[in-house]
Amino acid sequence: MRDTAFRSIKAKAQAKRRSLWIAAGAVPTAIALTMSLAPMASAQSSNLSSDAVVGSIAQGVTDGLTDYLKPRVEELPAGEVTYPEIAGLPDGVRVISAEWATSKHVILTIQSAAMPERPIKVQLLLPRDWYSSPNREFPEIWALDGLRAIEEQSGWTIETNIEQYYADKNAIVVLPIGGESSFYSDWEEPNNGKNYQWETFLTQELAPILDKGFRSNTDRAITGISMGGTAAVNIATHHPDMFKFVGSFSGYLDTTSAGMPIAISAALADAGGYDANAMWGPVGSERWQENDPKSNVDKLKGKTIYVSSGNGADDFGKEDSVAIGPANATGVGLEVISRMTSQTFVDRANQAGVEVVASFRPSGVHSWEYWQFEMTQAFPHIANALGMSTEDRGVECAPVGAIADAVADGAMGTCLTNEYDVTGGKAQDFANGRAYWSANTGAFGLVGRINARYSELGGPDSWLGYPTSSELKTPDGRGRFVTFEHGSIYWTATTGPWEIPGDMLAAWGTQDYEKGSLGYPTGAAVEYNGGLRQQFEGGYVFRTSNNQSYWVRGEISKKYADDGIFAQLGFPTGNEKLINGGAFQEFEKGNIYWSVSTGAHVILHGDIFDAWGAKGWEQGEYGFPTSDQTAITAGGQTIDFQNGTIRQVNGRIEESR
């Protein structure tokens, strides 16, 4: 595939010749496709017009033939979840959570007022200098999905290298998830279990979230593939003040000419069983005109417009081709429709005096590898429209000094920045993570979820300080960890990454770290009654209010976690102790005793405890407790044991066996 982009306003003289080429080249291609997909159509007419071609192709895609466009179902990697509180959003709109797949890839879950039935997810790829320039704002580049959008993640991150391509660029890449067959439009009525109001969500709800919560400078580009290309142009014409650039990669930029409503209706029926009448009402209605890109092209005057399409010719195996396999027959036909409608749009733009960068290729079909190519070809135009500096469009960089030594094995990937100052040291961003250096610790590179968690906590500015190791494998082989000046972060695929303060790490270490009965941490250390509490798979580690750290495990930890027990017992004053027949643990105001036959029970310091002790504690006459110590209505306390009961009534001890 060669770059054949041209400025349409400078090529009006060629418009007639192009139209003839389309008629002579693209239409026969479509006719050939129609013969294979819809043989009945050719029997009905021996002289097919371009309108008939479109209708015939549409007939051919109503039996699941667009399934090939559906991205592979891939779950996003589980990451640390945060809960941003963003002020000033429209009523009924909030960010429920932000999940950090990596330190530069965040998945927002949003409560929408326009589509309140279920949360909406949006992926953000953060700018190169997001961390090194924490007070800076950045432009947005929106990339809309196609007809077969799935709910797990954007097709862009599954099928293209968009994440890697933009890693060294200073823009926020915005990737809505879902929207199958929606055209990212506000639908007239609910259909097929969905109440699509995508345009309102994107322009009135998502945009303020990015502005107020993710450091947007409100300069925006909107792009899309196939259905998303149509949507990108429509949204830009409806909201011209929001976007400086609009790009369509194989979009359908004429929705109302004869044959196109049939094609769109067929596509929606094929991709999920949707009714096009529920989207824009009856064919020919005002809503169809409002969502016809060619009819509204004049509203884009003064913006940078990029339109691209192949011509349906399969170029797999040819020199300079980006194709990764032979063309799908349906993909040939869909690209022909895209080419014809995009040409109509460009011709209408020429008539209106609206300049378009038209990239009509001499080959190419309706497939993701071509759209990845167009993404890279469109970027210089996007960057110009958004006023991005040369430095913000990519970087020339190299690691030096200690950081260069730390990343010499290549695991960190290519650099995205040069070394920059952070509190007390240096940092440098790489494709796969970030390297840190301080005079006290030396240089270490961090990757993956541990690096993302460290970044979320504040990196070197956090209480952890600088890393003192690279990522290491845990002895049990199940997880990974990194040591820091004041603690560690441990990760497994099931628990995620969690930081452990140094003193609590030492207490955990007395149980042989992750190999012991406590297992891995399952959450962060949180404030708890003047101290800290951190949950593990098999119990807890506590930092008491006087800065002592102890662990509580197993059935004793479950009892201690019951409502109201902390108020009775206070913090632990030591770790669990094994005794004949069971175990016990001492707390500020009492103990918890456990045995296999009795379970775990609470006894408080005081007269009952002393009376039981006088009879030999759990090894004596009464044995282990079989109930918690509780208050009695007569005024006093009572507790049952294996061999009796001890009560305190009005200050007097009563024993019964």
Swiss-Prot record:
Cell compartment(s), UniProt: Secreted
GO cellular component, as recorded: extracellular region
Gene3D superfamilies found in the cross-reference section: alpha/beta hydrolase
UniProt GO molecular function: acyltransferase activity, transferring groups other than amino-acyl groups
Keyword tags: Secreted, Signal
Claim: Signal is one of the keywords in the record: yes
Main location: secreted
One Pfam family hit: Esterase
UniProt name for this protein: Protein PS1
Organism of this sequence: Corynebacterium melassecola
Gene: csp1
